[in-house]
């Protein structure tokens, strides 16, 4: 289901300057992630979820994890704000989810994934999540999906606002933003936020029983201008600086983590009636240091420089062509032990086409990546959709993907394996969906086969007590069914989903850890006069915390409730209760979870 009907269903009930003030139908919503160019969501074959700033404000999410866990096909395991977070999209790990900010990939080249605790909600205008492989367009990491966090300024009237709030466990937040036009053809935006909490003990006894808190500061900024009728220039920046406490697995006292993320991108775009072309140069830096009372630790840093030239051409009314060149260089450094190799380049070319004739749509994409460390990888994707009626559509999708070995896998001193190959996947899905005036629904079946999974194994198979190194030894098979529906009953809007997931380690014939076979979500929204209400219930079925499936994690249901009151056109106050029924559950063995908690915020718009 395309998560856009909510704004449409509630728009007639809204006050003019408050929330969900869109007047366009859900099919007119534009997205950019599915095929690397802007297109109406109705033309996207891939399963996509879109979450707007207004929806994030309504549910009063405090982290990106709280937004993602409401979406179909997603399971989230988190230790709370500022703690390690795992995101499983269709049963794949966080390492198999490509994360981008404004279309530029982020994440650590040493760990191989983005740190979701470093991605606060500051300045976010929209989130787009593609479920399923998109490697034929984006290359490595996009086996399970693509998450694009968009902070880019959305044209419209100028706006300025300040927000302050607090809550349980010493939580606080203070932020503000200004956005609007600059001169006759320019625009600018800046958003700042600081937040933190005293927290609670991340782990159970016998681990250290102290509060594990966090504090973050974040800045999002953008300036841009139109040059003539065809050119557009912009500079976008994002900065995060954070500290968090955690409980060390080895019992070291007062373990802490310091992290920073810096992303800047310069973009030049040209467009006319037929052609859209954009050139991007970006720099991304990711730093992390873990330390405690015993050790000062070492700082591990990833620097990624990116250059990308992408194009989209409307050849005829029914035929669109796209393609581009992408180059990026990953560099890593460690103030402690040095890597055997600390730099690698990746050069890629990609092509895509979309053809529509009558009630049919066909898509095809191919990409070639050439990398200094692991050679050449070719990926492809084919998709088709048929409109059975104006309200009913059937679609199918097939493709391949890969995940590059990390610097830790390849070059960590004394334990890296420079002979590693990328993990590879084959992905298939078929879907039936319907779009009606106040009802969207879909049923999707999918299968993914992932080979050459990297795992620790004995260097000498005949000597399991000897040295262990990363090796391509595992295989996984993932099958699932997604059911989604969005509909209105009177003044209530319902967004429901059910996921059946069978994610197996083929070698062990066991379920992959922390993936529930059954999960369900029900989100209800209500808006009338000056009140807005959001209730969510998330069910996560039984799962296992170990590869042998001996440590069972019981099923649980969490309910959150959020309410907003619009005092005036400028002032709003909001309150939220998380874990409404104070459910005591286990998301990860030996880790605590947050009890019932309360939050309140106030926002004033100028």
UniProtKB/Swiss-Prot annotation:
Residue span(s) of domain TBDR plug: 40-152
The record's subcellular locations are: Cell outer membrane
A GO molecular function held by the record: porin activity
Keywords, alphabetical: Cell outer membrane, Ion transport, Membrane, Porin, Signal, TonB box, Transmembrane, Transmembrane beta strand, Transport
Q: Which InterPro entries match?
A: B12_transptr_BtuB, Plug_dom, Plug_dom_sf, TonB-dep_rcpt-like, TonB-dep_rcpt_b-brl, TonB_rcpt_b-brl_sf
**UniProt domain TBDR beta-barrel: residue ranges:** 157-606
Lineage, top-rank taxon, reads: Bacteria
Q: Name one Pfam family in it.
A: Plug
Q: Residue ranges for motif TonB C-terminal box? A: 589-606
Motif TonB box mapped to chain:
28-35
| Topology with respect to the bilayer | Multi-pass membrane protein
Q: Name one GO biological process term.
A: monoatomic ion transport
Query: What are the boundaries of the signal sequence?
Result: 1-21
Under SUPFAM superfamilies, the record lists:
Porins
- Spell out the family assignment given in the record's similarity comment: Belongs to the TonB-dependent receptor family. BtuB (TC 1.B.14.3.1) subfamily.
- HAMAP family, A to Z: BtuB
| Role description | Involved in the active translocation of vitamin B12 (cyanocobalamin) across the outer membrane to the periplasmic space. It derives its energy for transport by interacting with the trans-periplasmic membrane protein TonB.
**What name has this protein been given in UniProt?**
Vitamin B12 transporter BtuB
Species in which this protein is naturally found: Photobacterium profundum (strain SS9)
The major lineage groups are:
Bacteria, Pseudomonadati, Pseudomonadota, Gammaproteobacteria, Vibrionales
Q: Name the gene.
A: btuB
């Amino acid at each position: 289901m395309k998560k856009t009907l909510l704004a449409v269903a509630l728009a007639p009930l809204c006050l003019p300057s408050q929330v969900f003030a869109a007047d366009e139908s859900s099919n007119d919503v534009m997205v950019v992630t599915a095929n690397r160019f802007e297109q109406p969501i109705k033309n996207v074959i891939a399963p996509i979820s879109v979450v707007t700033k207004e929806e994030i404000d309504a549910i009063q999410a405090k982290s990106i994890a709280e937004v993602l866990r409401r979406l179909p096909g997603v399971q989230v395991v988190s230790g709370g704000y500022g703690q390690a977070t795992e995101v499983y999209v269709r049963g794949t790990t966080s390492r198999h989810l490509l994360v981008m900010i404004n279309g530029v990939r982020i994440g650590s080249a040493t760990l191989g994934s983005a740190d979701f605790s470093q991605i606060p909600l500051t300045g976010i205008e929209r989130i787009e999540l593609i479920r399923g492989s998109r490697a034929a367009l984006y290359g490595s990491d996009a086996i399970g999906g693509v998450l694009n966090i968009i902070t880019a300024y959305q044209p419209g009237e100028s706006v300025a606002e300040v927000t302050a709030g607090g809550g349980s466990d010493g939580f606080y937040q203070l932020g503000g933003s200004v956005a609007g036009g600059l001169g006759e053809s320019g625009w600018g935006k800046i958003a700042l936020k600081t937040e933190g909490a005293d927290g609670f003990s991340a782990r159970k006894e016998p681990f250290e029983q102290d509060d594990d808190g966090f504090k973050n500061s974040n800045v999002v900024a953008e300036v841009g201008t139109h040059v003539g009728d065809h050119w557009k220039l912009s500079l976008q920046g994002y900065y995060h600086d954070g500290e968090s406490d955690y409980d060390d697995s080895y019992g070291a006292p007062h373990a802490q983590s310091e992290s920073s993320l810096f992303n800047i991108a310069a973009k030049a775009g040209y467009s006319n009636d037929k052609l859209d072309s954009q050139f991007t140069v970006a720099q991304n830096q990711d730093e992390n240091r873990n330390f405690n009372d015993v050790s000062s630790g070492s700082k591990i840093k990833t620097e990624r420089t990116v250059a990308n030239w992408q194009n989209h051409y409307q050849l005829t009314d029914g035929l669109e062509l796209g393609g581009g060149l992408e180059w990026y260089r990953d560099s890593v450094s460690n103030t402690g032990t040095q890597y055997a190799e600390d730099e690698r380049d990746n050069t890629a070319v990609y092509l895509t086409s979309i053809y529509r004739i009558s009630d049919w749509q066909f898509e095809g994409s191919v990409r070639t990546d050439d990398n200094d460390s692991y050679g050449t990888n070719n990926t492809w994707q084919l998709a088709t959709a048929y409109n059975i009626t104006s309200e009913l559509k059937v679609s199918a999708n097939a493709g391949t993907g890969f995940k590059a070995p990390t610097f830790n896998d390849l070059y960590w001193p004394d334990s890296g394996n420079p002979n590693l190959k990328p993990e590879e996947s084959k992905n298939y899905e078929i879907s039936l969906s319907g779009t009606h005036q106040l009802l969207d629904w879909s049923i999707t079946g999918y299968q993914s086969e992932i080979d050459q999974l990297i795992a620790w194994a004995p260097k000498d198979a005949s000597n399991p007590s000897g040295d262990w190194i990363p090796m391509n030894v595992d295989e996984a098979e993932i099958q699932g069914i997604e059911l989604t529906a969005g509909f209105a009953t009177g003044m209530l809007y319902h967004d429901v989903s059910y996921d059946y997931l069978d994610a197996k380690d083929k070698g062990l014939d066991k379920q992959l850890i922390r993936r529930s076979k059954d999960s369900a979500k029900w989100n209800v929204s209500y808006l009338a006069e000056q009140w807005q209400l959001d209730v969510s219930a998330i069910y996560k079925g039984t799962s296992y915390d170990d590869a042998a499936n001996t440590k069972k994690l019981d099923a649980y249901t969490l309910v959150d409730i959020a309410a907003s009151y619009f005092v005036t056109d400028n002032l709003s106050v909001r309150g939220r209760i998380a874990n409404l029924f104070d459910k005591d559950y286990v998301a990860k063995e030996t880790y605590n979870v947050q009890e019932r908690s309360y939050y309140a915020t106030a926002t004033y718009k100028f």
